Amino acid sequence: QDYLPEDVIARQNVIDAIRRVYERYGFVPIDTPVLEHFETLTGAAGNEVNKEIFTLETPEGEPAAMRFDLTVPFARIVSQYREEIKLPFRRYHIGPVFRADKPGPGRFRQFTQCDIDIAGARSLAADAEVIAVLCEAMRAVGTAEDGVPLFRIRISNRLLVDALLGGNGITETERMKHTLRVIDKLQKVGIDNVKQELGNGRIDDSGDPIPGVYLPETVISAIAEFIGVCGASRMETVTQLQTKLPVSDSTAAALSDMQELAALLDALGISEAEAIFDPSLTRGLDYYTGPVFEIEVVGMPSIGSI
């Protein structure tokens, strides 16, 4: 992507507005090299993301790679500078990332991420605060019209899906990962194609075969009911999910987390229009273990998640 002066100015104005919000909430900046040791980036990403990493070799023959996000470099920073960093560490990082992905609408091989994280905070209050900061950042860049938000934050919890799969006998790691990747395609390919991929697989529009997970029909139906839950409010969604999950300690813990998060978002003044609970959001990255959220622009699906 090339940016001419008018686009550069507009883009910088957006980044500056986001940065001001981050700093107002007490987040401090860091920066890391675009190039990382290959093993640093591949250790936490998972096989699907590993396929999207731009790799190269240093003049000394050492494998290196271009960062595909800003979270893995942040994990390295926290580990490497543990004696110098005081926890909880509230950092923001704005910079380009690179993915050897197939370009398409809303998908680029280089794009800018505006990351915030709170390292060393175990409370769900930290997740709720990050969501609140993201809402304010989106408002600051003008994604609202007559008080109506033009963005939506979709929120789920990996523990919910883990409880669903574990309660239905799906415990083998690679099979769970495959299932999560298929579920995460829901908005892109629709429920019928998702159900086919959870079963014996399907043929895509280009005629290429897509392998299936080969789950039993009863499990596919349970997953379809689970990801189809959509309550009128965050708390109502949690209530409906209770009827779609097997009874277990892990289910109780996951639902308790979602109830607490719903209450925190209400207390922070986050409207139901700005943030919804969506159990179909799973993401494919292996390092997600609890709450998961992403932002989308309302009415513009071609942009993808932001």
Regions found by a protein language model. Name each.
Residues 2-8:
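Auxiliary tRNA-acceptor-end handling modules of aminoacyl-tRNA synthetases
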Residues 51-59, 169-203, 297-300:
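Acidic, His- and aromatic-enriched active-site or binding-groove loops in soluble protein domains
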